[in-house]
């Protein structure tokens, strides 16, 4: 794995990926789309299923089999945005805007309005998990860091399209039509349900899976195993 510092390329990053989706559904945006994805969407698909595997980047994919599905279906490689955190990246997909426009930059952010840190995806207080926003006089998610979700943008620009999302329970809902899925089995079942029962409906489905949790867990188990082996050798 290279130690080279990779800077965001805002002409070829995840922002351009979601911009292509917005462009496909006639949403006006000032950001540049991704040419490789634009070309793919020229086939005018009836349904678009957009799956985000959080944390499953290029270095991990490069260690998979050359005969595998991901390798054979690869059409491009883009950078993330800055900062390249889960919250910043996912909100780029949700808003169709970069972090420097939305203000969503970290998993936990301090707000002077509360004098507390808030987990951005769950809207809960970071240390005690309390819902301090409900009883507060101001909701920063309705003002300071508010954005228009792409689901709403798409349905406004293309009224014949129904936009859905499937996301984990820890994440706040951003679409009018939202289904929860906390593992791969639930994900696959949900996608199958959509495709089977909504074939007559044009829609956009965005799926968020926290793959980095499983990857980090595997790395932790490997480190513990290596430490155990070293201790036994001594």
Residue ranges and their predicted role:
Residues 1-32, 65-74, 81-219:
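His/Asp/Glu-rich, glycine-adjacent segments
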Residues 33-45, 193-196:
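A short acidic-Thr-Gly-centered motif at the start of a beta-strand
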Residues 46-47, 96, 225, 229:
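Catalytic cores of glycan-processing enzymes that make or break glycosidic bonds
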Residues 50-53:
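Short hydrophobic beta-strand that contains or immediately precedes a catalytic carboxylate
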Residues 55-59:
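Short acidic, Gly/Ser-rich segments with clustered Asp/Glu that frequently serve as metal-coordination loops
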Residues 60-64:
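Short, solvent-exposed loop/turn and secondary-structure capping segments
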Residues 213-234:
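A long, amphipathic alpha-helix that forms part
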């Amino acid at each position: 794995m290279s130690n080279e510092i990779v800077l965001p390329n805002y002409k070829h990053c995840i922002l351009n990926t979601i911009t292509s989706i917005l462009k496909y559904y006639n949403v006006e945006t000032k950001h540049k789309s991704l040419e490789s994805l634009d070309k793919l969407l020229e086939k005018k698909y009836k349904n678009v299923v957009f799956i985000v595997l959080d944390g499953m980047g290029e270095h991990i994919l490069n260690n998979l089999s050359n005969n595998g599905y991901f390798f054979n279906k690869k059409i491009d490689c883009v950078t993330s945005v800055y900062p390249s955190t889960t919250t910043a990246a996912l909100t780029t997909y949700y808003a169709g805007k970069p972090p420097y426009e939305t203000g969503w930059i970290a998993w936990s952010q301090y707000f002077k309005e509360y004098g507390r840190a808030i987990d951005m995806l769950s809207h809960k207080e970071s240390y005690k998990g309390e819902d301090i926003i409900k009883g507060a006089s101001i909701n920063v998610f309705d003002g300071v860091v508010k954005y228009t979700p792409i689901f709403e943008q798409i349905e406004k620009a293309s009224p014949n399209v129904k936009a859905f999302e499937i996301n984990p329970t820890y994440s706040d809902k951003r679409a009018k039509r939202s289904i929860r899925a906390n593992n791969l089995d639930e994900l696959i079942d949900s996608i199958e349900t959509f495709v089977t029962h909504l074939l007559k409906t044009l829609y956009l489905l965005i799926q968020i899976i926290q793959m980095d949790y499983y990857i980090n867990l595997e790395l932790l188990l490997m480190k513990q195993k290596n430490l155990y082996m070293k201790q036994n050798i001594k």
